[in-house]
């Protein structure tokens, strides 16, 4: 038995057969024009003629005719190629009941799809070989179709022995008087049979019944894109499956098997609904808006601490409103704006000595600037604008002149501009109190600038989960298997097609 099974494979393998009139290089180029998994069983240089309505032969083209076994399409074709340009000039499929005639040794005719066609061969030897290859192929196909028509158990005749098993026939043959007994037994049997008949009441309702949606998949044509379920279409789009893959016979079979293994269409739909993540993202929290108001409310409290309300500079000259923060720091300090924003907690650290009225608070603060660093937290009541308290000695000259003269205010502004230049030297001097706070603020700014770069694009591997990820993994394995297969393996696969009955359909 083993030897009998090993004999069929050798004839199945088909190799390319070139033309006798072409060089080996031209034959090799011809084989490459055939396409993947296609083999030419015979090749010859020919002229193609077609019969017009006037029953006159007209030349259509010249080239190399090939009897092609097209494994992807599972059919046989007569194809003519132009070996110079590598183009397919004409083709004719070998349909069922195809008849191949040879009125001349070099002139062969057959019925095409639209008209009568003829091949005029350049060499009679090639014409003989080509005709033999075509007729042998047609003969094999004819035998296969006949085998398919005849049932496998056709020659067996079991009916000859059936009459022996029938007791009624034997009684009729040998015993006439027993006919009455037979009729009685028949009536009894009929009565029993009537009792055993099932009614609608005896038929129970179906159990474990599940309605499984139709996937719309056909083994030969793949998925029906016109009637494809929208949810399945969405799944295929998420997985990056193209329409060509859905139409491909083998790839669509892999996808169909995956759907069946996961429980069918309904199970896939339910899984997709479970994994749907759209609801959570829309929640745009309202917390962001509330936090900003507290920051805006922060600035008002500091000025309230300075017995007056707004800082003195604006009260003296409304046009000088922007510069007040700088003059407030005649001493060594960092840029005025940052401390003003961060100052609400340390603002109470104003010196106890500030007898001057509300308008001139900035100068009095400068007088006792030397004492300011130690007691900043405890004395919130002392007057003074939010950030102005500084430690300069220049403020002593301003104490007698805080009458509100614009010249003094301009001097303070100028001094503030000088402080901006000195702030680089003042950073190392800071040791406690407001200066320490300024250093912290500066460090915080540096940290912010450092944290801008590190993180860029982490969110990528999230979507590959659940049924989508499983299907994507299956498709990746499928693509790897396709790309990793060599042409030699493809030829080995072709061996199984020689006697495949599906080609007859």
Swiss-Prot record:
Residues 276-349, 356-365, 372-391 have a biased composition (Pro residues). The modification Omega-N-methylarginine is found at residue 307. Pfam families: PBD (PF00786), WH1 (PF00568), WH2 (PF02205). Coiled coil: none annotated. GO terms for cellular component: cytoskeleton; endoplasmic reticulum membrane; nucleus. Residues 203-216 form the CRIB domain. Residues 486-505 have a biased composition (Acidic residues). One of its GO terms (biological process) is actin cytoskeleton organization. Keywords: Acetylation, Actin-binding, Cell cycle, Cell division, Cytoplasm, Cytoskeleton, Methylation, Mitosis, Nucleus, Phosphoprotein, Repeat, Transcription, Transcription regulation. The keyword Ribosomal protein does not apply. Gene3D superfamilies: CRIB domain (3.90.810.10), Pleckstrin-homology domain (PH domain)/Phosphotyrosine-binding domain (PTB) (2.30.29.30). The keyword Cell division applies. Residues 186-198 have a biased composition (Basic residues). The modification Phosphotyrosine is found at residue 256. This is Actin nucleation-promoting factor WASL.
